[in-house]
Amino acid sequence: LVVLLQGTREEDDVVREQLVEGAGTDEKALIEILATRXNA
């Protein structure tokens, strides 16, 4: 998943915080979030 995190360091920090907060979320949801962010 880390490979998919592209953008500024500040943006990546925000995404990492969200991933940590959502650590209990299933993997499909995380992939969906990352895919949506990458396509934005």
From Swiss-Prot:
The N-terminus is blocked. The keyword Calcium applies. It is found in: Cytoplasm; Melanosome. A pair of annexin repeats may form one binding site for calcium and phospholipid. Seems to bind one calcium ion with high affinity. InterPro entries: Annexin_repeat, Annexin_sf. It comes from Oryctolagus cuniculus (Rabbit). May associate with CD21. May regulate the release of Ca(2+) from intracellular stores. Its main location: cytoplasm. This is Annexin A6. In the lung, expressed by alveolar endothelial cells. Not expressed in tracheal endothelium or alveolar macrophages. GO terms for molecular function: calcium ion binding; calcium-dependent phospholipid binding. Belongs to the annexin family.
